[in-house]
Swiss-Prot record:
Keywords, sorted A to Z: Carbohydrate metabolism, Chitin degradation, Chitin-binding, Disulfide bond, Glycosidase, Hydrolase, Plant defense, Polysaccharide degradation, Signal, Vacuole
Active site per UniProt: E134 (proton donor)
Protein name listed in UniProt: Endochitinase 3
Domain named Chitin-binding type-1: residues: 19-60
Length: 318
């Protein structure tokens, strides 16, 4: 009897401690100082944080090299997004501030701090490039060029619907709309729900916090960036070289590089049919930001010859 009781207790304890974070728990984060293992558990040993064992909140380099402020300075940030406070932009009055970006990034320890300095710079350039495309206010003949107008908009343009899909897990709140907001233009109740749970904010009842609270706005975008969505890897794992394409990925021409990140975000509409102006816009931002950070953009920037992963978080919004 004692043996059976002990076994049952151990199983209950195991179930209670499993699936605390990461893709197994809707992108939920561990407490500060803990890593999320590839199995979705939180801890701070090599089994959780070591190479090949960690899926998110992984340790960066030691000392100053692991500090995001050492990768991108305030002046670089302003140079990249130098028209975000233009009078024509919703983000004027410095909504998308450097301090808000750094503060939000602090909740995701691996973001911009994983790998060597080249990997860290490329991640910041890629993140700001993809989100700049989603929020751009630029046009071909815009002052300083079309790639100087990222982070202009806070909310989806036009007349968006409520983006409410019936769900018992992520029920829509009365009168709330879940259209695109923030740097990554997160949309749909089934994305606001898990994002809010991961960052500790009730976004189902308060979706507009993504467009009114600067730190929450950046957190929503970094959450998307860091969260794998099977069969897709996370954008973070791609740009830092942690993702290794499977046989199916290779057969679909999905190889490591900036192009796969575009495929993750909006491959269903933009990838697999040759040249696409939206893809080229993303690449244009990326090349400019890599130049400012003093790093090469790497290979495989396009996704024109890649088959898409299928629908993603943003496929219906862009």
């Amino acid at each position: 009897e004692f043996t059976i009781f002990s076994l049952l207790f151990s199983l209950l304890l195991l179930n209670a401690s499993a699936e605390q974070c990461g893709s197994q728990a809707g992108g939920a984060l561990c407490a500060p100082g803990l890593c999320c293992s590839k199995f979705g558990w939180c801890g701070n040993t090599n089994d959780y944080c070591g190479p090949g064992n960690c899926q998110s909140q992984c340790p960066g380099g030691p000392g100053p090299s692991g500090d995001l402020g050492g990768v991108i300075s305030n002046s670089m940030f302003d140079q990249m997004l130098n028209h975000r406070n233009d009078n024509a932009c919703q983000g004027k009055n410095n909504f998308y501030s450097y301090n808000a970006f750094i503060s939000a990034a602090g909740s995701f320890p691996g973001f911009g701090t994983t790998g060597d300095i080249t990997a860290r710079k490329r991640e910041i350039a890629a993140f700001l490039a993809q989100t700049s495309h989603e929020t751009t206010g630029g046009w071909p003949s815009a002052p300083d060029g079309p790639y100087a107008w990222g982070y202009c908009f806070l909310r989806e343009q036009g007349s968006p619907g409520d983006y409410c899909t019936p769900s018992s897990q992520w029920p829509c709140a009365p009168g709330r709309k879940y259209f695109g907001r923030g740097p990554i233009q997160i949309s749909h109740n089934y994305n606001y729900g898990p994002c809010g749970r991961a960052i500790g904010v009730d976004l189902l009842n308060n979706p507009d916090l993504v467009a009114t609270d600067s730190v929450i706005s950046f957190k929503s975008a970094i959450w998307f960036w860091m969260t794998p969505q099977s069969p897709k890897p996370s954008c973070h794992d791609v740009i830092t070289g942690r993702w290794q394409p499977s046989g199916a990925d290779q057969a679909a021409n999905r190889v490591p590089g900036f192009g796969v990140i575009t495929n993750i975000i909006n491959g269903g509409l933009e990838c697999g049919h040759g040249s696409d102006s939206r893809v080229q816009d993303r690449i244009g931002f990326y090349r400019r930001y890599c130049g400012i950070l003093g790093v090469s953009p790497g290979d495989n920037l396009d996704c024109g010859n890649q088959r898409s992963f299928g629908n993603g978080l943003l496929v219906d919004t862009v």
